[in-house]
């Protein structure tokens, strides 16, 4: 299953998930081995199948925990998975049970489940919606269970708050000690029926595999059943005797040697479960001072906050599930360095946190003498392992350390040490580079070793849904990028002409330009100093420092190379083994910093390689949006065309190359810029007068309070108007120029020669018209002849069929006449024996039935309709190409992102030019 990382989900008013982040696909896939999907999760997946991959072939021998999507209309045999399933009595049909699942208060999902023939505990479930418009999408879940021939454990109503019938008789009141209001009721029902200890493990497994909202009871305080001391004592003894590993999700809590604070409910007086040697096993106390628990241990009481919220809001909360609670408890126990009853231990959870966000645990270590900074929030609480992520750490300094409030700190995330930049009082920002997936500890430090804050569990997640336009996988893409880097470095270091530069005579103008370029690029020395300082302070990771070193080396070498070219009167005709120059390789790699260096050196950005491609062509071909923005802001021409090839005889623009690679938004942006640039060139040449009205209207328009989607559509409409107006003005200029050329030719031509030319033209036109008429007549005659020939042949074939049938009937008649003697000789026997014994008519000859003559169907091909259909398809394709950006929201978003990047690059380039001009005036 793959899809996009974020997006609004369809049917959120039914299943309760608004985005993919709320749905938490990764956690769902991880838990697919140990539990069935809930009805609201299934409904969300089936309604939003466009975000995931639809399998086109059946899976072969899927393992436990496998979840796949199929299209029943496209793949009828999706159940042929290679497993041997239980059959019906006929031994052929798979024995599948059928039920309807409820989402909310209505039945919305079909479920068909089958058991394995060889392994009865291996179960397959097939889900699809009752909605006729979406019933073709099927979700299939395979799982190894602990029950045989059991009904689906998925509750019929995912929002139900009643305890189901298969709940164990002994249940202890439990709740998370976080600030999440996920308990919309006041307690749990405790039943007094006693069962044998031999079934305890099965019951405990059933309890821990229930959904969290199945354990909730109606919020009727008067009718609640309160747990007795005998019930609690029984459950405590069972928890002590339960072996480790026998319970999933919540098993760490049963095997943990410590105390767990259970929040209070109406009717229960602060029950605390103790499992240590200082107190009897299974004892419950209503006072925190009993059994060695510190009465100052911080806890949270939810009885006041629960009653203030409606039940639906609490059930829709991200942590309203038992699995999330189990993960929180597991992290709490695994990260805790000591006993739970340690007063220094404090479990903090952010209220209202999404279910896709990992549980955050703060705890202090005994080796920390004092906490200087108290972290209250870290945003975001997780990051993708393949991306560089910006982290905001919020908190406050203790009163005795307020003088450190404006100092920069160091953020320690696992083995990484990155600088934490001060933004405002109590807020720090740091950038985490890509790391391997996993959960690490995050804290702040002054010297990079000793923590000054509590620890924060930070998770690096693996990317499951990638939405990039790069067709190669990540490894091949990295190798390709590395190859371009090697080619650039080789070209820069092998094309040096220092000896010829030093021995040749340098003109004063070139020497002055070289000095200006050297003064403008003097800031590169500061970059070396900053890199050395960062490495010595151990503020950057090794991979990031290595990349900075390589990039800084290329910058300095490019600076020296440009100085040589300026002295050599800007002779830059050096290519690598594949015909690319330095600026083209920089464009492919997306090195936007090189554009400013080329601009300062006054070297053309439209320098072509051996194929006639410019840097803008290469940047558009590889989808380098920032590089395209930097080139356009520096003055690169978007209307240049590559050299003609066999596939494209007229050459390609940068927009054509971007469209070939699937970058529709970038192609639309470059196409608009190409038309505007062509218009400005013709305006400069004097072929067009006036300006584009759409550009004026766009500059004067106010975006207002439009959202992102409306703004993207507005930009798309503005781009279409600009392109249409520019194209119309250019075509009008072409027609006007052609009319002027014809008028001038008529004006300066002599009358005799003009008359001769007119007569010759009339003769040619007359001859051409006669030729066209004769050709059409000949073509019509050939068509008519072929049609008549075909018609005559068809009639001949029909007549031959009839003649063959007549001949066959006649031959049969002759054969029957030859056998009349035999028929007469057996007549007596027929009458005497057959009539007497069989009591029926005798043999009277062969009755030949005349076959029905079927005329062949007349299939006359209509050439005019075929040609008309082809013409309509051509017109439709043309319209699709023009309106491509209107049909794709992704293209509109790409266009807007490209537009904003260009505006930002233009402002940055203008600012650098102003600073350079001010520095020149001062000097």
UniProtKB/Swiss-Prot annotation:
Stretches assigned to the IQ domain: 757-786, 799-828, 875-904
Induction: By heat shock, UVB, wounding, abscisic acid, H(2)O(2) and salicylic acid.
Name of the molecule in the record: Calmodulin-binding transcription activator 5
Stated role: Transcription activator. Binds to the DNA consensus sequence 5'-[ACG]CGCG[GTC]-3'. Regulates transcriptional activity in response to calcium signals. Binds calmodulin in a calcium-dependent manner. Involved in response to cold. Contributes together with CAMTA3 to the positive regulation of the cold-induced expression of DREB1A/CBF3, DREB1B/CBF1 and DREB1C/CBF2.
Region (Calmodulin-binding): 824-846
Provenance organism: Arabidopsis thaliana (Mouse-ear cress)
Tissues/organs with expression: Expressed in roots, stems, leaves, pollen, top of sepals and siliques.
Similarity comment: family membership: Belongs to the CAMTA family.
GO process annotations (BP): cellular response to cold; regulation of DNA-templated transcription; regulation of transcription by RNA polymerase II; response to cold
